[in-house]
């Protein structure tokens, strides 16, 4: 066992990924059910988009050579043959010396190779005067200029979002092959933990971590209905729960029992599981230091801290990367960072990478970052935070006015 020194969580996790079995089973789903799923194949375009040349402006479809030398003093005068309606394929061609009105997005008629903007024209029935010349292709979008037939649209391993769904629909692709969602078993541990709908007796506390983790990973994974959800600090109960979970789950997570006192029990139970190994125990981060990452039969086991804030940070930095990897994602770091200016001075322990809960004022440029100074176990500030400011391990804090990297929540 060794401490994992995190500068980039995804970068530091890369060496252990090969110990885990990725999801290989796939299924076909409608694009209307594909948001948040991991694409299991490369998606290529089967057609040119647009399929025909279109106008990018309101104006007149012309043969560009008919406008050569046109100016306000010596306009080109073309015979108006008719109008093109949006969404219709023109039924007539234009010959030299002719033009047709065309709206933005209209399909160019045969014989036209450019569009004169309406601002540079004047209709004098039955003619239209053109006050400037246009080059071939001007104010048009050509077939395949947006998407070419055979073009790679979305690569395998992409986590599909709204923008991808829109592209698929635009390209006429209505079903996609995605990886099966990884099955995730989530447990909370500890004699002091009671269900959220209970009134805790003195010395007890409601389970915050279980619901939080289910919300965090319920989009990308299938959360299993395990029993018991809360495991007491008893070896037999923990061993039974983990063995049963590993029979049905792709990933097992448990929070609590990973810090001093009960952590030895968790480590001991994991070691007793078939084909298991503790890959690392403890991270040089705060909050989130007492984290266990293990493997059993190619399946990840994550032992997360008991404090909700510590559990959240560890699950975000470590759990997210592992779950996305197992699910088939090709993303290396599924986080969004910004840079801002810290408002007040803060201190941190050297050698520890600290993630500080902060409020962000986006009305300033660059954004102003205000620390929410509190203990790692305080839950309220986590819910109110806009982001986590990263203090590098080589620093002993940040001075007011110093630039800081912030992971958005």
Task: Give the label of every model feature segment.
Residues 3-10, 14, 25-28, 32, ...:
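Electropositive phosphate-/nucleotide-binding environments in soluble metabolic enzymes
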Residues 2-4, 60-229, 373:
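Short, glycine/charged-enriched hinge/interface segments at domain edges or termini
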Residues 2-10, 174-304, 308-314:
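Helix-rich terminal scaffold detector
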Residues 27-32, 41, 87, 147, ...:
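Flexible glycine/proline-rich
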Residues 53-55, 70-73, 91-95, 108-110, ...:
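Solvent-exposed alpha-helices and their adjacent loops that cap or buttress functional pockets
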């Amino acid at each position: 066992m060794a401490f994992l020194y995190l500068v980039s969580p995804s970068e530091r996790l890369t060496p252990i990924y090969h110990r885990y079995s990725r999801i290989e089973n796939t299924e076909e789903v409608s694009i209307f059910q594909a948001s948040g799923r991991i694409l299991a194949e490369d998606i290529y375009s089967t057609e040119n988009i647009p399929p025909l040349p279109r106008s990018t402006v309101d104006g007149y479809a012309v043969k560009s050579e008919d406008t050569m030398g046109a100016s306000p003093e010596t306009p080109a005068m073309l015979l108006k043959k008719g109008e093109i309606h949006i969404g219709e394929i023109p039924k007539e061609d234009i010959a030299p010396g002719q033009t047709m009105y065309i709206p933005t997005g209209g399909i160019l008629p045969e014989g036209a190779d450019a569009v004169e903007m309406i601002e540079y024209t004047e209709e004098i029935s039955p003619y239209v005067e053109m006050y400037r010349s246009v080059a071939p292709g001007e104010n048009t979008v050509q077939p395949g200029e947006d998407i070419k037939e055979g073009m790679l649209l979305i690569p395998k391993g992409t986590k599909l979002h709204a923008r991808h769904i829109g592209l698929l629909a635009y390209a006429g692709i209505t079903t996609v092959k995605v990886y099966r969602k990884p099955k995730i078993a989530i447990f909370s541990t500890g004699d002091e933990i009671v269900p959220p709908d209970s009134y805790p007796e003195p010395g007890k506390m409601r389970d915050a971590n279980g619901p939080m983790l289910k919300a965090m990973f319920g989009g990308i994974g299938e959360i299993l209905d395990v029993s018991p959800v809360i495991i007491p600090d008893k070896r037999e109960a923990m061993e039974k729960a983990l063995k049963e979970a590993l029979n049905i789950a792709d990933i097992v997570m448990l929070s609590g029992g990973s810090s001093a006192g009960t952590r030895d029990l968790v480590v001991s139970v994991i070691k007793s599981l078939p084909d298991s190994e503790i890959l690392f125990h403890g991270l040089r981060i705060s909050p989130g230091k007492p984290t266990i990452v293990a493997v059993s039969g190619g399946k990840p086991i994550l032992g997360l801290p008991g404090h909700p804030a510590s559990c959240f940070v560890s699950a975000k930095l470590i759990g997210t990367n592992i779950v996305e990897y197992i699910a088939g994602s090709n993303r290396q770091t599924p986080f969004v960072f910004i840079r801002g200016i810290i408002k007040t001075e803060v201190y941190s322990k050297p050698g520890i990478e600290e993630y500080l809960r902060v409020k962000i004022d986006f009305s300033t440029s660059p954004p102003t970052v205000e620390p929410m100074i509190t203990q790692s176990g305080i839950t309220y500030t986590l819910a109110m935070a806009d982001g986590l400011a990263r203090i590098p391990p080589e620093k002993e804090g940040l001075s007011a006015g110093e630039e800081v990297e912030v992971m958005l929540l």
